[in-house]
């Protein structure tokens, strides 16, 4: 898997299946065409009659044979008059009909599946359709519109990125359930208001979701839309992170001021000022570039970019998904040279994925959201969050985790670093086969979480606890 080119398993086999279905449909149609007699009528040909004639039994019995005048051109069917090589020509035509119909049907069906269906669900900023993993989806729609007349209240932060995400979910629900009403409820969270202190000192990432969760618990909202990496590992009783949407780019990007000639991390000059408040990003970059100077960076994406362009920093680190969703395509350089490889900077748990939080006792809302749950990405996110939860990871600790699912293999890699940047990264990974056939989402979730916990225990066995203790004893530093 490569950041910026995020792949979903099953797409290749799905394309092949589309072609096969189309070809089969064309073959069946061609057989029906031939059997109906239309094919032979289409290929009836003026021929010169020859004396060799099929004689009906009734005429043969009476010896009243029909006479065909010499040199007479008549319109005949190959099933009526037997002329030389008529059988061969009929076979050739039959094969031609079968081949042409199968090819055309397969081509048209493939084009419709690949482009016609996707054209109806294209979303802004290149975000792939949420329900793109149709073969894995939990959706069990039967044609009934359970959304008709239903109102869904969506709690969201007020930042441009948060609003984009909420509007995206709104459009998906309206597409899935005609007649549904989706109301957005923008809210200011404490995390949005406190911009002069590191979050580790004032409560961590939970400050971005607490007000939204309160609205859910008080039944003022039905769902809350989040950037999954900002959601705490432990949720309040009565709430569940029930939906993980199709994941976008999970990687980080190094962004340069407008007009800069820099193209990648390697191009940064010695001692460059890099804006990021993330301990996760800092400790990994320090191992590659110990000369860099990190400066505090807070605010929404637009604010951070404005600070960069004003000269406060030589570069800043942002999530690639946020840039792409907001349409800052000019900040992603040609060839995506400024997208940082996950081998250099392992992403945060859940980075790049939208998630939806809801009440555990609300089956009607859960049914409406079910088609948005993208199981392959839900599996990887569940694995990452389980690892982080096992380590009691919060914003004070430089923990990163990235799971990848490909060809039935689930691979999890996690890293823990020192908040001082002086010690080496502790890195552990493991891969195991995750069978899909006949498995339910709860079964897949349980096994993926078990892998996350196992990798976390491997980190602890390798000495990660010392780094964790160091981080929690040094909360005056930044946040991860």
Swiss-Prot record:
Where does this one sit in the cell? Plastid, Chloroplast
Q: Give the pathway annotation.
A: Porphyrin-containing compound metabolism; protoporphyrin-IX biosynthesis; coproporphyrinogen-III from 5-aminolevulinate: step 2/4; Porphyrin-containing compound metabolism; chlorophyll biosynthesis
Name the catalysed reactions: 4 porphobilinogen + H2O = hydroxymethylbilane + 4 NH4(+)
Cofactor names: dipyrromethane
An example GO BP is: chlorophyll biosynthetic process
* CC cofactor note: Binds 1 dipyrromethane group covalently.
Q: Which residues form a coiled coil?
A: none
Kindly state which keywords UniProt assigns to this record, in alphabetical order.
Chlorophyll biosynthesis, Chloroplast, Plastid, Porphyrin biosynthesis, Transferase, Transit peptide
- Which PROSITE patterns did the record assign? PORPHOBILINOGEN_DEAM
Extract the GO molecular function terms from the UniProt entry.
hydroxymethylbilane synthase activity
Query: Pfam family of this protein, just one?
Result: Porphobil_deamC
Q: Which HAMAP family does this UniProt record tie to the protein?
A: Porphobil_deam
Please give the function described in this protein's UniProt entry.
Tetrapolymerization of the monopyrrole PBG into the hydroxymethylbilane pre-uroporphyrinogen in several discrete steps.
Spell out the note in the miscellaneous section. Answer: The porphobilinogen subunits are added to the dipyrromethane group.
* Family membership noted in the UniProt record: Belongs to the HMBS family.
Name the record gives this protein: Porphobilinogen deaminase, chloroplastic
Organism phylogeny: Eukaryota, Discoba, Euglenozoa, Euglenida, Spirocuta
């Amino acid at each position: 898997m490569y950041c910026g080119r995020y792949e979903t398993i099953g797409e290749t086999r799905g394309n092949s299946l589309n072609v096969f279905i189309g070809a089969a449909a064309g073959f069946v149609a061609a057989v029906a065409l031939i059997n109906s007699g239309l094919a032979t009528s289409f290929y009836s040909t003026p021929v010169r009659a020859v004396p060799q004639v099929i004689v009906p039994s009734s005429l043969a019995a009476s010896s009243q044979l029909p006479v065909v005048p010499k040199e007479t051109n008549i319109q005949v069917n190959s099933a009526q008059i037997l002329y030389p090589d008529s059988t061969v020509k009929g076979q050739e035509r039959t094969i031609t009909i079968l081949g042409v119909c199968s090819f055309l049907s397969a081509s048209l069906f493939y084009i419709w599946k690949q482009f016609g269906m996707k054209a109806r669900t294209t979303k802004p900023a290149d975000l792939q359709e949420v329900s793109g993993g149709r073969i894995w989806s939990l959706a069990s729609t039967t044609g009934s519109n359970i959304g008709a007349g239903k109102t869904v209240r969506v709690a969201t932060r007020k930042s441009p990125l948060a609003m984009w995400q909420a509007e995206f979910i709104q459009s998906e629900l309206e597409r899935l359930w005609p007649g549904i009403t989706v109301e957005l409820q923008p809210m200011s969270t404490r995390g949005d208001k406190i911009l002069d202190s590191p979050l580790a000192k004032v409560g961590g990432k939970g400050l971005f979701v607490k007000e939204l969760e309160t609205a859910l618990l008080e039944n003022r909202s039905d769902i809350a839309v989040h950037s999954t990496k900002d959601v705490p590992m432990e949720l309040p009783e009565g709430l569940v992170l029930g939906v993980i949407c199709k994941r976008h780019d999970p990687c980080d990007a190094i962004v340069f001021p407008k007009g800069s000639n820099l193209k990648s991390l390697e191009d940064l000059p010695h001692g460059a000022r890099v804006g990021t408040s993330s301990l996760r990003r800092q400790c990994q970059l320090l191992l590659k570039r110990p000369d860099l100077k990190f400066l505090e960076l807070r605010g929404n994406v637009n604010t951070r970019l404005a600070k960069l362009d004003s000269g406060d920093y030589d570069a800043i680190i942002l999530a690639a998904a946020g840039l792409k969703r907001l349409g800052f395509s000019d900040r992603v350089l040609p060839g995506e040279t400024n997208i940082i490889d996950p081998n250099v900077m392992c992403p945060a748990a859940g980075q790049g994925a939208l998630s939806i939080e809801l009440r555990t006792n609300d089956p009607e809302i859960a049914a409406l959201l079910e088609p948005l749950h993208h199981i392959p990405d839900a599996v990887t996110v569940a694995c990452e969050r389980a690892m982080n939860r096992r380590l009691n990871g919060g914003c004070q600790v430089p923990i990163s985790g990235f799971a990848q699912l490909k060809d039935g293999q689930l691979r999890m890699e996690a890293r823990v670093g020192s908040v001082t940047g002086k010690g080496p990264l502790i890195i552990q990974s493991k891969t195991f086969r995750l069978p899909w056939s006949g498995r339910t989402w709860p079964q897949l979730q349980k096994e993926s979480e078990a892998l996350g916990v196992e990798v976390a225990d491997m980190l602890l066995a390798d000495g990660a606890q010392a780094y964790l203790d160091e981080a929690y004893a040094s909360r005056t530093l930044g946040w991860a």
